[in-house]
Amino acid sequence: MSQELRAIVRVGDTDLEGNKQVAYALAKIRGIGIASAYAICWKLGIDPHAVLGALPEEQINKLDWAVRNLHEVAPAWFLNRRKDPETGRDMHLIGSELVLAAKRDVDLMKKLKSWKGIRHSLGLKVRGQRTVTTGRLGAVAGVTKKKATPGK
């Protein structure tokens, strides 16, 4: 039975290349790394080295469901947003949800004027890195050479 290879497969609101292996294609989704991709494949019983575009539609639908509902498939320590401040639930965010959640977290820190929020608002390092020599802002003045006086 000759099955056609789909060039683009849509999983988790992301267009994935159909000619890549399942695990590496899934890792292109923001919020899904290579470890998460292998775990999803293992949990669903799909060969992670199979070509994504050659999978039947039912397996692609299973992959889509697992990517969207990783909190139901994986243990809590595997998720990227545990104990969400708003809901208190363990979640795994993907795509633009992940970016917006990170932005909301930073904006909340700025609003509360916590130490991290102040550092974020000033554009400084947040996680305790040294700032004596690195992370300098602004243009560099540089060194200019004096003009040689003629005749001397």
Curated annotation (Swiss-Prot):
The entry's cellular-component GO terms read: cytosol; small ribosomal subunit
Q: Which SUPFAM superfamilies match?
A: S13-like H2TH domain
Which Gene3D superfamilies is this protein grouped with?
1.10.8.50, 30s ribosomal protein s13, domain 2
| Disulphide bridges | none
Domain of life assignment: Archaea
- Protein's UniProt keywords contain Ribosomal protein: yes
Biological processes, Gene Ontology terms: translation
Give the molecular function GO annotations. Answer: rRNA binding; structural constituent of ribosome
Q: Which Pfam families match?
A: Ribosomal_S13
Q: Which residues cross the membrane?
A: none
Give a yes or no for keyword Signal in this entry. no
What InterPro entries does UniProt report for this protein, alphabetically? Answer: Rbsml_uS13_C, Ribosomal_uS13, Ribosomal_uS13-like_H2TH, Ribosomal_uS13_archaeal, Ribosomal_uS13_CS
Q: Which UniProt keywords apply?
A: Ribonucleoprotein, Ribosomal protein, RNA-binding, rRNA-binding
Q: How does it assemble?
A: Part of the 30S ribosomal subunit. Forms a loose heterodimer with protein S19. Forms two bridges to the 50S subunit in the 70S ribosome.
Record HAMAP family = Ribosomal_uS13 (MF_01315)
Q: Which family does it belong to?
A: Belongs to the universal ribosomal protein uS13 family.
Please give the PANTHER family that the UniProt record associates with this protein: 30S RIBOSOMAL PROTEIN S13/40S RIBOSOMAL PROTEIN S18, SMALL RIBOSOMAL SUBUNIT PROTEIN US13
Q: What does this protein do?
A: Located at the top of the head of the 30S subunit, it contacts several helices of the 16S rRNA. In the 70S ribosome it contacts the 23S rRNA (bridge B1a) and protein L5 of the 50S subunit (bridge B1b), connecting the 2 subunits; these bridges are implicated in subunit movement.
Protein name as it appears in the record: Small ribosomal subunit protein uS13
